[in-house]
């Protein structure tokens, strides 16, 4: 019986590997003619398919050692060097929130061993909250904080922790004109910061070196990365990714390379919505 089970398991693993390889070829062919980014260059790209896709289709953050991913209802943890997922939590939305209608995990941010997740309901987006997970285990800590509806009328697609200021930022999804600033400990609103220009369809954001970087899913396919001065609200284009209108931009994170320079890691859903890509960029000279 054991030998038979072992044989079946080996065959199953080989079949899964073959299917994954075929899917990687297909999604690679879909994206082979993507124009080069403007203002940055691609370092590498990791593609996730099959089961891993459902762990990586929404948000990403990092703590310098690991990536933390979100799918619509799942969480994943990966080695920051290889991108290989080694820990998951499925059905990560707590039961008490599901009973209230929450059904979608969006962008992530993390600090001090806690992953902060933007979670919303749908399709009317009547409720939004920040849910706290343990970064080691990816388990719910028992803490969540509802967000004010008048500042999140289209849900909360992302959140970003500012460790230096002890803040957490959010914004409206469509044509956001202000940055919402909450106290990291209490999630009470501190202030709003007017932005120098609207930012549309922000899907993820992360702080790096005192600046807030945003990944936007503009429908024209440019998919800009914006840099926001959180003191003045000034918004500038950091670089343009040019991944195409068929690709859906998702979350992003930033970490420092061995020289202290930023590495931008941007998550996308493939044109067929059967794969996700984590692309690493460095700014052009």
Mark where each language-model region is.
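Repeated scaffold domains used in trafficking and secretory/extracellular systems
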Residues: 54-61, 98-107, 150-161, 198-206, ...
């Amino acid at each position: 019986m054991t030998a038979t089970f072992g044989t079946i398991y080996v065959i199953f693993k080989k079949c899964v590997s073959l299917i994954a390889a075929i899917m990687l070829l297909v999604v690679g062919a879909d994206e082979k003619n993507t124009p080069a980014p403007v203002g940055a260059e691609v370092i590498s790209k990791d593609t996730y398919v099959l089961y891993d896709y459902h762990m990586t289709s929404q948000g990403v953050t990092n703590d310098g050692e690991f990536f933390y991913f979100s799918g619509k209802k799942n969480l994943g943890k990966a080695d920051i060097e290889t991108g290989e997922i080694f820990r998951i939590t499925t059905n990560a939305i707590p039961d008490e929130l599901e009973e209230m209608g929450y059904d979608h995990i969006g962008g992530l941010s993390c600090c001090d061993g806690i992953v902060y997740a933007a979670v919303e309901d749908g399709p009317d987006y009547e409720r939004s909250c920040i849910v706290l997970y343990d970064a080691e285990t990816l388990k719910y800590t028992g803490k969540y904080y509802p967000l004010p509806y008048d500042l999140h009328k289209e849900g909360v697609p992302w959140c970003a922790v500012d460790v230096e200021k002890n803040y957490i930022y959010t914004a409206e999804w469509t044509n956001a004109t202000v940055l919402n600033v909450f106290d990291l400990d209490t999630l009470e609103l501190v202030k709003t910061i007017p932005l120098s220009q609207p930012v549309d369809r922000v899907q993820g954001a992360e702080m790096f070196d005192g600046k807030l970087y945003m990944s936007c899913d503009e429908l024209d396919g440019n998919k800009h990365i914006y840099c926001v001065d959180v003191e003045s609200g000034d918004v500038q284009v950091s670089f343009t990714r040019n991944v195409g209108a068929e690709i859906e931009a998702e979350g992003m994170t930033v970490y420092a390379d061995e020289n202290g320079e930023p590495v931008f890691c941007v998550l996308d859903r493939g044109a067929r919505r059967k794969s996700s890509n984590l692309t690493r960029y460095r700014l052009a000279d």
